[in-house]
Amino acid sequence: MLMITSFANPRVAQAFVDYMATQGVILTIQQHNQSDVWLADESQAERVRAELARFLENPADPRYLAASWQAGHTGSGLHYRRYPFFAALRERAGPVTWVMMIACVVVFIAMQILGDQEVMLWLAWPFDPALKFEFWRYFTHALMHFSLMHILFNLLWWWYLGGAVEKRLGSGKLIVITLISALLSGYVQQKFSGPWFGGLSGVVYALMGYVWLRGERDPQSGIYLQRGLIIFALIWIVAGWFDLFGMSMANGAHIAGLAVGLAMAFVDSLNARKRK
């Protein structure tokens, strides 16, 4: 038996299980704090996870509703059907995921109102020896973003990856990954470019590396990242390193973040195997 995912809303879980039944895949639901979805035939895990990704994008798709009607599990008052986008946001994001997203948005708004330089004077990596004991600076550089595309790209990945880690492994694990990767990726980046940088991408790359390798080595963890996405991450790092797009990228933070995530996943998966 392999646990595929968990849903806070049992009726959302049932909708996914009903749909997979129409595709010839039998899933079961076990109720604990959340509705855990389990797969008996582990050879179908790749297919189920691909379908799950599509389901989370739009759980209100008519094919899922039709599957629930066919199975006799539908009914009225399903708010996730009426507001699928916000339901998907709530379904995947835990409190730490939300707090980080809100903090980044608040800082971004402040940068638009006060200007980048004013905010960076308070949040940037220590740019003067006198600031080295302002410990928040070693982490708050991750909250700053310099364009709408920059913040949207990072927060989308943060929600997708950070939410998965928090839902499956707990808020504590997400906090640890975030703090370690922000600290180490920031340290490496300031060696490359000095202290004037910002963005959540170092943490995002750490989450990419962590989710991918942990899923590969410890499928029972319930987190998973398609190999195509980790390949995309590597291509993006190479493109940034050789300046193929003419964009200013925090290449040091990306590489360091990815390395941190892979290392933490390797250690955690080893510990998980020892406990079995």
Swiss-Prot record:
GO MF term (any one): serine-type endopeptidase activity
Q: Which residues cross the membrane?
A: 94-114, 142-162, 169-189, 192-212, 229-249, 250-270
SUPFAM superfamilies attached to this UniProt entry: Rhomboid-like
EC number(s) from the headed UniProt entry: 3.4.21.105
Q: Which cysteines are joined by disulfide bonds?
A: none
Broad class of enzyme this protein falls into: hydrolase
User: Known InterPro entries for this protein?
Assistant: GlpG_N_sf, Peptidase_S54_GlpG_N, Peptidase_S54_rhomboid_dom, Rhomboid-like_sf, Rhomboid_protease_GlpG
Q: Which residues form the active site?
A: 201, 254
How this chain sits in the membrane, per its record, is:
Multi-pass membrane protein
Task: Give the source's domain of life in one word.
Answer: Bacteria
Q: Name one GO cellular component term.
A: plasma membrane
Q: Which GO terms describe its biological process?
A: proteolysis
Q: Where in the cell is it found?
A: Cell inner membrane
Function per UniProt: Rhomboid-type serine protease that catalyzes intramembrane proteolysis.
Which PANTHER family does the protein's record reference?
RHOMBOID PROTEASE GLPG (PTHR43066:SF26), RHOMBOID-RELATED PROTEIN (PTHR43066)
Q: Which NCBIfam families match?
A: PRK10907.1 (NF008155), rhombo_GlpG (TIGR04239)
What is the name of this protein? Rhomboid protease GlpG
Species per Swiss-Prot/TrEMBL record: Shigella dysenteriae serotype 1 (strain Sd197)
Q: What is the lineage of its organism?
A: Bacteria, Pseudomonadati, Pseudomonadota, Gammaproteobacteria, Enterobacterales
